[in-house]
């Protein structure tokens, strides 16, 4: 039987740790940042026990540091996730997640009649928040979608 203090996921020397991702969202985050195509070692923890969430996902990406722009995209998938930059096995920086006001070229508009499906234009959404709910309003067709509807398509 494992010692109670034993880590279930190995520590990394340098890189980024994204913790407290809601369960079943980790793979989407992995694909969003194309970590599944990275040559660096990526450790994925799915459905790990969490006192706050019940279950959570965790990503550790060696020798890779996410940008503030990537952190704002991450906020759409996991607004309460924590992002830590690691150097020499120590947390050197905690990156706050802030929802962007606008997000362009990341998500596909769910409206099949939207101009973004037939023309060479990047999708663009205004991010709307109301309490804990996050909605995205398409710049072109002006339809409003819940965050889950848009992020589930991609």
From Swiss-Prot:
Quaternary structure (record): Contains catalytic and regulatory chains.
Pfam families registered for this protein in UniProt: PyrI (PF01948), PyrI_C (PF02748)
Lineage of source species: Bacteria, Pseudomonadati, Pseudomonadota, Gammaproteobacteria, Vibrionales
Organism: Aliivibrio fischeri (strain ATCC 700601 / ES114)
InterPro entries: Asp_carbamoyltransf_reg_N, Asp_carbamoylTrfase_reg, Asp_carbamoyltrfase_reg_C, Asp_carbatrfase_reg_C_sf, Asp_carbatrfase_reg_N_sf
NCBIfam families, alphabetized: ATCase_reg
Entry keyword set: Metal-binding, Pyrimidine biosynthesis, Zinc
Function: Involved in allosteric regulation of aspartate carbamoyltransferase.
One GO cellular component term noted in the UniProt record for this chain: aspartate carbamoyltransferase complex
Family to which the UniProt record says this protein belongs: Belongs to the PyrI family.
Keyword tRNA-binding annotated: no
Listed GO biological process terms: 'de novo' pyrimidine nucleobase biosynthetic process; pyrimidine nucleotide biosynthetic process
Requisite cofactors: Zn(2+)
A GO MF label: metal ion binding
Binding site for Zn(2+): 109, 114, 138, 141
Cofactor note: Binds 1 zinc ion per subunit.
UniProt-recorded name of the protein: Aspartate carbamoyltransferase regulatory chain
Domain of life assignment: Bacteria
Record has Metal-binding as a keyword: yes
